[in-house]
Amino acid sequence: MTKRTLGGTSRKRKRVSGFRVRMRTHTGRRVIRARRKKGRSQLAV
């Protein structure tokens, strides 16, 4: 059996889909708005 080597990095995750990154663009703000409307406890990473 081979090991799962792709662990994921928190810095990259934040840079790609963090709250401040979302707020930068119009579509990102739309994502946040949609998640607020749906009642998500976590809006972004």
From Swiss-Prot:
Gene3D superfamilies: 1.10.287.3980. The keyword Ribosomal protein applies. GO terms for biological process: translation. One of its GO terms (molecular function) is structural constituent of ribosome. PROSITE patterns: RIBOSOMAL_L34 (PS00784). Pfam families: Ribosomal_L34 (PF00468). Residues 1-27 are annotated as: Disordered. One of its GO terms (cellular component) is ribonucleoprotein complex. It comes from the Bacteria. The keyword Ribosomal protein applies. Residues 10-27 have a biased composition (Basic residues). Keywords: Ribonucleoprotein, Ribosomal protein. Belongs to the bacterial ribosomal protein bL34 family. This is Large ribosomal subunit protein bL34. It comes from Prochlorococcus marinus (strain MIT 9211). The gene is rpmH.
